[in-house]
Amino acid sequence: MVSPVIDVWREGDVLVLRLYIQPRASRDHIAGAHGDEIKVAITAPPVDGQANSHLIRFLAKEFGVAKSRVILEKGELGRHKQLRIDQPRQLPEVIARLLDV
């Protein structure tokens, strides 16, 4: 069986992630692979940018960086997003496995 190629890569000190977001989840967590993206479940509703703000706060905490270092590049209004994380201090276990670190 061929494993899917997940879109997570490094550009120097920047980590780039392609995500599939599940809003209104029971808890915040990085669920793992979802096709060629990483599924992230968050508790915030997809209303008035609440989910995006919550996602940035959650990922900043998970990667040990300031919120200003998490940049939403694509997908502001949809579930499919691309984010850049500048100089992550730590990698969540799910992401580390995908990068084979």
Curated annotation (Swiss-Prot):
Q: Which Pfam families match?
A: DUF167 (PF02594)
Q: Which domain of life is it from?
A: Bacteria
What's a GO cellular component annotated to this UniProt protein? cytoplasm
SUPFAM superfamilies per the UniProt record, alphabetical:
YggU-like (SSF69786)
Q: What family classification does the UniProt entry report for this protein? A: Belongs to the UPF0235 family.
> Which HAMAP family does the protein's record reference?
UPF0235
Name this polypeptide is given: UPF0235 protein SG2030
